[in-house]
Amino acid sequence: MASRGGNQSSDRQREHTPERGMGSASHPPPRPDRSPSQSPPPLPPKRNTYRRVGSNSSIESQVVLVSETSRSSLSPERSNSPPPIPPKKKPRKTKHVPLQDISQDSEEEREQVQLVRVGFSYPPVRIIEKDGKRSVEKIDNNDPISKGATSIAVRNPLSLPLVSAWEKGMEVMAVLMERYRLDNDLRTSFKLMPEQHEQYKRICHQYVNEEHRGIPLTFSSMKTLTAMMGRFMQGLVHSYSEIAHNNWECTGCALWAHGCTDYEGKVKCLHGTIMIQKDHIIEMDVASENGQRAMKENPDRAKITQNRWGRNVVQLANNDARCCVNDANCATNQFSSKSCGMFYTEGIKAQEAFKQYEAFMKAVYPGITPDQARMMLIPIHCDCNHKPGCAPVMGRQTCKMTPFGMANAEDLDVATISDPTVLASVRHPALMVFQCCNPVYRNSRVQNAGPNCDFKISAPDLLGALQLTRKLWQDTFPEIPVPKLVIPEFKWQNRLQFRNVSLPAGHYDSRQNPFDF
């Protein structure tokens, strides 16, 4: 009992003993400044901080919001422990921009929407508009719309195979080269290019030798005839395959409304103006072909005399020579830079040649109109300048036109001849002959002479070349009608003026630097 009482007294002493300035647990010290009903003071504003908490996976990461007040309110014991890991958040999915709606509508909804068009994709789709919104709808392969769209897309209205212009031309040329036995090198190298003219000439040459051997020509060479047939054949092939060139005529020809038969004794040049008359004297070698022809055709105007060097020459005085208006002040065989290069030694003979061609056209084509008969088919380019993109050459730019008289034609009896084509030459014994643009350069000893060739064909033979080319097409392709060959009408252009100076041209060089810097 005593021990129990002593223990109680010691416990009471402990209760009354304050610990470090504070009241006992059972009797805390009074707080006069605080009443039980007084509200607690306001808390300071929260300051939020962000802290990244990593997870075990390397992809996921979370952001945890931590309040500053919560940090301060934590007890020392709890502040030492790590904060609890918040629950993991699901990763946010990236939202893409929605594309056009692809929906499967019912049959009732199909009637309410408007069909815009049917696409050509596979599987097929149709693009429709509904409530102002355009959407794409998949179409089943068994849908009748899909079958109809497919048939419309591939159907050819002409029921013909779809081929290109190049393929059509190559098919025609393959048949021609096979029939007329061209060399393998010419066949393999042919690509239907504008500058490839040799194949056409070979085909026409073989055709003339096989089908028209010994064809009569008047003041024309066989080489020029086949060359012109090759040009016309190239024009037919391009017309059949619908190939067109903007700045180049493959035939090198034109239809000239010359008007040289409108007034008696007056002829016109390529400018369309009347040519002027001037005296002209020609001296030719006695042994030359031209000298002998001058003695036979003009015995009253030709005479043999000596020139200033003491040589015997045939001197032919032409008092009826005609020249272009721009060459009025130029000497013989001299042309100005504005000239067309046309010159006739005899104006009356030139007019007879134009009349002969007009009568010849009416005899060959009786249904032709008078205006069409007055249009002459003339070659603009000879072999020298008949190239795509060819630069102007020195001298004359068009073929030289020379009237040739037909000897002994006046002696024929008109009553004994029934062929109207022959009667045209009997009544008008002169032919217009087309030669190289600059035939004077052929025998010239000048070092800077321009190009020249042996191009020579008369106006009737040029028309015959066109007729033979059409005959060649009919014999080779009887099931295909002859294509239309549209030849342009001649119009004077400044690029056809006579050139006294040649333009400088460059040459190929393998080096990139000409001076090896």
Swiss-Prot record:
Self-association state and partner proteins as the record states: Homomultimerizes on viral ssDNA bound to pTP. Forms a initiation complex with viral polymerase, pTP and hosts NFIA and POU2F1/OCT1. Interacts with host SRCAP.
Stretches for region Disordered: 1-110
Organism: Human adenovirus B serotype 7
Pfam families from the UniProt entry: Viral_DNA_bi (PF02236), Viral_DNA_Zn_bi (PF03728)
Composition-biased stretches (Low complexity): 64-80
Disulfide bonds: none
UniProt protein name: DNA-binding protein
Record field: compositional bias (Basic residues): 87-96
Modified residues (Phosphotyrosine): Y180
Metal-binding keyword on record: yes
Gene, per the UniProt record: DBP
Function: Plays a role in the elongation phase of viral strand displacement replication by unwinding the template in an ATP-independent fashion, employing its capacity to form multimers. Also enhances the rate of initiation. Released from template upon second strand synthesis. Assembles in complex with viral pTP, viral pol, host NFIA and host POU2F1/OCT1 on viral origin of replication. Covers the whole ssDNA genome during synthesis. The complementary strand synthesis induces its relese from DNA template. May inhibit cellular transcription mediated by the interaction between host SRCAP and CBP.
InterPro entries attached to this UniProt entry: Ad_DBP_C_sf (IPR036367), ADBP_zn-bd_sf (IPR036368), Adenovirus_DNA-bd_a (IPR003176), Adenovirus_DNA-bd_N_sf (IPR036362), Adenovirus_DNA-bd_zn-bd (IPR005376), ADV_DNB2 (IPR037540)
Binding-site list for Zn(2+) 2: C382, C384, C436, C453
Biased composition (Polar residues): 1-10
Subcellular location: Host nucleus
